[in-house]
Swiss-Prot record:
UniProt topological domain (Cytoplasmic) ranges: 1-3
Gene label: ftsB
Transmembrane segments annotated in the record for this chain: 4-21
HAMAP family associated with the record: FtsB
Keywords carried by this UniProt record: Cell cycle, Cell division, Cell inner membrane, Cell membrane, Coiled coil, Membrane, Transmembrane, Transmembrane helix
Full protein name: Cell division protein FtsB
Provenance organism: Shewanella amazonensis (strain ATCC BAA-1098 / SB2B)
Coiled coil start-end: 38-75
Family: Belongs to the FtsB family.
Lipid bilayer topology: Single-pass type II membrane protein
Assembly mode: Part of a complex composed of FtsB, FtsL and FtsQ.
Acetylation listed as a keyword: no
Length: 105
């Protein structure tokens, strides 16, 4: 009876080793599960991006307003008869340097 128990114990140890450290082990399972969840979240982000791009393409194909807006923003185009004004704000560094020069006087 004792050799039978030893064989069963050895078999159990072998199966436990395969479960924890062998091919398709629990550590590999959890690693793959984590990689799958990361991949799925990346896929979801890409799907959202694709939807935004599809909407933008549809908007550009269907109307001239989006095309005109894009030309104005990205290319700086203006319509005939329009006057372009560039508003230049005060730079905070130049204000500080002028305040410092006034303090030094």
């Amino acid at each position: 009876m004792k050799p039978f128990v030893l064989v069963l114990f050895a078999l159990l140890a072998l199966l436990q080793y395969r479960l924890w450290f062998g091919e398709n082990s629990l550590t590999e399972y959890f690693t793959l599960k984590d990689r799958i969840s990361h991949q799925q979240s990346g896929n979801a982000e890409l799907l959202e991006r694709n939807e935004v791009l599809k909407e933008e393409i549809q908007d550009l194909k269907s109307g001239t307003e989006a095309l005109e807006e894009r030309a104005r923003n990205e290319l700086g185009l203006i319509e005939q008869g329009e006057t372009f004004f560039r508003v230049v704000g005060n730079d905070s560094r130049s204000i500080r340097s002028s305040e410092q020069s006034q303090d030094n006087q």
